[in-house]
Structure formats: C-alpha cells, structure tokens
Amino acid sequence: TACIATLFATLDEAPVGIRIQDVRIPYSAIPMAALGIGALGSFPLDALWHQAYGLDVTLWSPTHLMMVGGGGLATIATWLMLVEGRPAGRATLLGRGIVALALGAILVGLSCFEGEFDFGVPQFQVIYFPVLIAAAAGFALVLARAALGPWGAIKALVAYLIVRGSVALIVWGALHHTFPRFPLYLASAVVVEAVAAWLGTGNRLRYALVSGVGIATVGIAGELAWVKLSGWGDLPANDARIFLVVPAAGIAAAVLGGALSKPIRAQRAVPALAAGLAGLVLAGTLLALLPRHVGNVNATIRLTPVGDQAIVGVELQPADAASHATAFGVVSWQGGGRVSAKLNEVGPGRYVTDRPVPITGDWKTMVGLQRADEVMAAPVYFRADPEIDAPAIPALPQRQAAFVRNTTLLLREQHPGPAWPGVLGYGGLATAALVWSALFAFVAHRLSGAGAEPLVPQPVRPAQAPDSALRDTLPQQDSLAPPRGRPSL
C-alpha cells in the first residue's frame, strides 16, 4: 500500500510528503511501510519462537502481537492517507462514506487485540477485556466524531458492526467454527456523540477527557449488559481494580484519539505533553495487568454422568478460595464449539455446575479460577495428544487436583527453551510498538501544518467575509473539510 501511494503521488506530482528528486513519498506511507515491515519481520521471529518453545496457541505471544498489530494498526495509517490525499472542495457522499468506513476499520483493527477473549477461553487476566474495550472505544470513536462531525461516532460504529458481523457469520456459518463474540460499543458511541453535542470538539483535550470518562463508565456498563444478555460470560465487575484501570485506559486512549485528529480543524489541539502522558498511562495500564500468578488452592472434582456429558462438582480447599474470584467456572472447547457452565455454591466451598459439560471425544474441559492477578485452572478431561506427547487426563468420577497456571493446560504444546529467542521476540515487539507510535505522532503533526507548509495554497478571503475578530467568535467547523481548489472525490 505504501508503494502504491508513493507511485501515484509521484505520477500525479502531488504536493504531499517528502520529495526525493522526482519521487514523492506521502507522509502517511511511512507508518504504513513500517507496519508492513514489522508484521512481515515477525514471521521469522515466530518460527524461531516455535522452534524454541513449541506452538503457542494464543493471540498474545510477542510475535503474534506484531503480526496482529501490523495489520490492525494499518487501519490508522489508511485514514491518515485519506487525510493527506483528500481532494479539495467539500466531500461528496461517497467521499464521506469512504472516510467513515476507514474510521470504522480503525475500531475493527483495535478490536483485534480483544481476540484473546472473543472465543471465550482467555489465557490472561479477564480484567483485560473491559480495559481493551474502553481503550478501543476511546481512541476510535473520539477520533471518528472529530473527523466526521455530527453522528461521526455512530457512522464509524455502523461500519464496524457490518465488518465484524460479516466476519463472525463467515467464521461460524461458512467455516463452522465457534461464533466469535464481540463488543457492540453502542453505549460508548452514544456517549461520545452526547459529549460532542454538549461541549463541541473544538477544544480537543476537553472533549477527549470527558468522552473518556463517559466511555469508562456508561460505555462499559453497556458492554456489561450486552455480555450478560448474550450469554458470553461475565466481565469482572467484582474486581475493585476495574474502577482504576478501566478509566485510566479509556481516558488515555481518548486523549490519544483526540491527538491523532490534529489534522482536522480545531480551536485547540491536544498538547503534545498531554498526548505523551496519555501514551505512558495507557502503556503502563496494559503492562501492569500482565503478571499471572498461582495461589495455593486444591480441589476435589466429582463428575455425575449425564449421557456423554457430566455435571461437575468442585470442592475447594480452602473453602473460601473463590469467595473473591474475578472469574470462576467450567469451560469446554475444541470439540466443535465452546461450552461454559457457571459454578453455583451449594455449601461452604462446594460448587456444582448449572449444566452438564462434555467429557468425551476431542473436547477439553477444565475448571478455571481467577483472583485478581492469579490465573489458575484444574483439569476435568483432556484427550491424549500423541503429536505433542501430551497424555490423556481421563474424566474420573473423583479427582484430587491442585490448581496450576492455566497455560499449563491451555498450552500443553509448549516446552522449555533457551532465553534468547524470548528476548528477541519481546525486544522486537517493544521496538515495533515504539517506532509505530512515534511515526503516527510524526505524521499527525506534519499533516496538521504545524511542521509543514500547507498542502495546497489557501484561498483568498472574499471581501464580504467576516473580519478576523468576528471570525474567531464563530464556531469552528467540526468535520473533515479540506481546502477548496480541486474537484471533489
């Protein structure tokens, strides 16, 4: 994409980006190229990772995050290309539709990082889920409303729902895999529209801060209701940390979305210092939730057969081990879908599933328990997997089991290896993230005109136009309105 943009900018002699003799490189092509290079560079690192540690069936290994990040964040570079190459004149219906689709694609791209939770068998702290939802909504919807004007957040949301819904139907209906659930972002979009209607978007920092607060409260409450209504599972509403990390992520991401809207006309852009602090807060929030520990918990697991399934009874030692759990239940997967069952307390430390779960065939079934940063599991049934030398864990009428780190069961393909491939993998991810972030900031700055000459000559103000003092009192245009002079798209 970066090469194609450079080719046409050169052929058209477009007044964009960097000029090297007769070659014109759009500013937006630079992060697009960096994203592609980072994603492609992750493939040999991923092969090395697998050779050193075995297969890692998770979205969130460092090499997989480089792949997903390169593709998902390319949607941001695509929007920057539309801004840089926008035609002069007022945008047509088609042009605004393309921009709305691009901004909806940003929400899709950022939601890719939630894929670890989309299929209902996550390996990380479940509190990440509302944090990622708040961050994606804060960044994409705040940017969309600033770029598209009134109803911009709703337009981007509609584009997102069309794309995500279509993909989910293909995965489930055509490919016959587990239906991937996804957040709706409806409450968040309504919040952003309401804030913009109330405060306007001219003061981008104020608009972003208030929108972020609304997303982290009303928006996440809406997602809690959606998750509950759809039977997806439970968000960790009983985890006190949610009142700190979700607002931190939502507000920080909203400020970053407001900062990226710098090329769009505003009375006051987000200060660079505020954007930098927001980036540090968001990164710190995501990194703070990475640790996964194991508590001293044991269980007696009893099965009551129901056909080829079973009701699972779990007796915990100590009895109060799940009294403050952020997630606790039984989940089955890999047998042709996903089955989850709640564990209802029937006595001190004794729990029974609310439905039978599979314990035969290709299914894998385990009891999951999370308590803040403790992410644990105990096996119920796992078939043998001779390809990776993993023995069967049969479905016994009664089993004594100690809870272990959940990846011990979820990633039975993994094995120990040397440290240096891990250093390369995590180092590559950190380098890519820093370079990509810096390039996005650079391009947004250049396209704003703060560090570059205007892309096209500014039109002469008509004689009947209001004088500067009066003009400064008029409301600033709240949407993407390029300079006049060339035909519209």
Cite the ranges covered by each PLM segment.
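Membrane-interface interhelical loops and short amphipathic "cap" helices
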Residues: T1, L45-L65, F113-I133, R164-H177, ...
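Aromatic-anchored segments of alpha-helical transmembrane domains
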Residues: G38-P44, A105-E114, A159-W172, G214-L224, ...
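Cytoplasmic C-terminal tails of single-pass
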Residues: A450-L489
